[in-house]
Amino acid sequence: MAEYLASIFGTEKDKVNCSFYFKIGACRHGDRCSRLHNKPTFSQTIALLNIYRNPQNSSQSADGLRCAVSDVEMQEHYDEFFEEVFTEMEEKYGEVEEMNVCDNLGDHLVGNVYVKFRREEDAEKAVIDLNNRWFNGQPIHAELSPVTDFREACCRQYEMGECTRGGFCNFMHLKPISRELRRELYGRRRKKHRSRSRSRERRSRSRDRGRGGGGGGGGGGGRERDRRRSRDRERSGRF
């Protein structure tokens, strides 16, 4: 019996635990759901709830009419948002394996950002800190998410351009970033790994020669760039 219950846990056959919450980390019924939402006590993934504001869904003029936002402006706005959040997560909390943003319209998914860290400790640290921070004038609501495999959480029909439910689909409609930004963000991480490897090799050679000093001043430029970037973000009023 125990093996059977374990095999159906989080599936449609499970009458106790909510399969949607298990797969997606969100459920349209919320606290009114008749099945249990088992919130994880540890996870690599965090959810930042309703943090992304799609200007195509919210832009209105003073007279209440919807303002047109071009696709180019939309992509630029989204890429800027994605880069800002991704960079903040990596610089403050730890290495990010992947980050995804929901483009759904349902209340339980709209604007949700899912950040999967390489280490569970970094995810836990991020949740604790982010719940005391604000973004774009709003308090951040962060929580650990059960989602670790986004292939199970995504709407396959949407990826093929065939979803008939539109923005109110209960599976994730993930908004893509531009190819250029993807190369920049994830390529930067690969360069960082190579740089760390070379740095370890240099330290090893230095120890072999029995010398320890001389290389401590090279990080000033990077620290200055980090300070400038932090000041720029403060002026922008987002994080």
UniProtKB/Swiss-Prot annotation:
Phosphoserine: residues bearing it: 61, 145
Domains: entry comment: The C-terminal SR-rich domain is required for interactions with SR proteins and the splicing regulators TRA and TRA2, and the N-terminal domain is required for formation of the U2AF1/U2AF2 heterodimer.
Positions of post-translational N-acetylalanine modification: 2
Sorted UniProt keywords: Acetylation, Metal-binding, Methylation, mRNA processing, mRNA splicing, Nucleus, Phosphoprotein, Repeat, RNA-binding, Spliceosome, Zinc, Zinc-finger
Lineage top rank: taxon: Eukaryota
Name by which UniProt lists this protein: Splicing factor U2AF 35 kDa subunit
Basic and acidic residues bias locations: 222-239
Modified-residue entries (N6-methyllysine), positions: 39
Gene Ontology molecular-function annotations: RNA binding; RS domain binding; zinc ion binding
Tissue: Expressed in primary spermatocytes and elongating spermatids (at protein level).
First and last residues of each zinc finger (C3H1-type): 12-40, 149-176
Species: Mus musculus
Gene3D superfamilies the record matches: 3.30.70.330
Biased composition (Basic residues): 188-208
Family from the record: Belongs to the splicing factor SR family.
Purpose of the protein: Plays a critical role in both constitutive and enhancer-dependent splicing by mediating protein-protein interactions and protein-RNA interactions required for accurate 3'-splice site selection. Recruits U2 snRNP to the branch point. Directly mediates interactions between U2AF2 and proteins bound to the enhancers and thus may function as a bridge between U2AF2 and the enhancer complex to recruit it to the adjacent intron.
Primary site of residence: nucleus
